[in-house]
Amino acid sequence: MTTANTTAKDNAATKKRGRKAKKRVCAFCTDNIDKIDYKDVARLRKYITERGKILPRRITGNCARHQRQLTKAIKRARQIALLPYTVE
């Protein structure tokens, strides 16, 4: 039991001393993109993992509005077979 407590304390200490992560900025806001186009497959692929999952907002740094639009665009592109649902 002491090893579990020690490990938890070490992790907490590392987080306190660790370097603070840089705040990510929404790429769509910086490029002044209002609507995300589902036909822009090259841009959409940046926000999909190698297994075909949509990356979350905390990783991509998108704002809530653009993350919702991005999700809809990816799902729409999957329906018309521009993007795969899963990668084999």
Curated annotation (Swiss-Prot):
InterPro entries assigned: Ribosomal_bS18, Ribosomal_bS18_CS, Ribosomal_bS18_sf
Comp. bias regions, Low complexity: 1-11
GO cellular component: cytosolic small ribosomal subunit
GO terms under biological process: translation
Record's keyword terms, sorted: Ribonucleoprotein, Ribosomal protein, RNA-binding, rRNA-binding
Keyword RNA-binding: yes
PROSITE patterns reported in the protein's UniProt record: RIBOSOMAL_S18 (PS00057)
Function of the protein: Binds as a heterodimer with protein bS6 to the central domain of the 16S rRNA, where it helps stabilize the platform of the 30S subunit.
Designated name of the protein: Small ribosomal subunit protein bS18
Gene name in the database record: rpsR
